[in-house]
Amino acid sequence: MKVKNTIAATSFAAAGLAALAVAVSPPAAAGDLVGPGCAEYAAANPTGPASVQGMSQDPVAVAASNNPELTTLTAALSGQLNPQVNLVDTLNSGQYTVFAPTNAAFSKLPASTIDELKTNSSLLTSILTYHVVAGQTSPANVVGTRQTLQGASVTVTGQGNSLKVGNADVVCGGVSTANATVYMIDSVLMPPA
């Protein structure tokens, strides 16, 4: 009986140490990321809040606001594009995987769509929440179909530097923030009608 208790206590302690090691693992380094634009992004932002290391210190909406590639997304999330839509507190308070359209992705949208998003809060909210999935998903596990906060599903295909989210290519993904895993994508995803 004493041997079983000792083995159980040892196993419990080992499991606790393993969990602690995972909990304090460093954020992804530039070499752990996926996507053809990661090396360029890491080189352009080697230090500071916009760096891969810097983003890991902040909740996702704060990290996005520090990222020079995500200024349009930040404006859309924070009420700057449409004062009736502010998802900052929501995104900063849970664990998420965020498929983050870059500034270049937003620039592909027609000007009329951007104008509509400035006044149509339900459409903007639907589009933004279609880019967010509950729970953090690493590059090794991101492929598959997942339900978004918007309610519809999004499918991730490919592998390594050739991941796609719907029809959008992942530019750089697997970026850890304090509460999310971010995949920067080259197109804005539109939820199904």
UniProtKB/Swiss-Prot annotation:
Protein localization: Secreted
Keywords noted in UniProt: Secreted, Signal
PROSITE patterns: FAS1 (PS50213)
SUPFAM superfamilies per record: FAS1 domain
Signal peptide: 1-30
Cystine pairings recorded for this chain: none
GO BP: any one term: cell adhesion
Any one annotated GO CC term: extracellular space
Highest taxon in the source lineage: Bacteria
Residue ranges of every copy of the FAS1 domain listed in the record: 57-189
Pfam family, one: Fasciclin
GO MF annotation: an example: cell adhesion molecule binding
Subunit structure: Generally found as a monomer; homodimer in culture fluids.
Protein name: Immunogenic protein MPT70
UniProt organism field: Mycobacterium tuberculosis (strain ATCC 25618 / H37Rv)
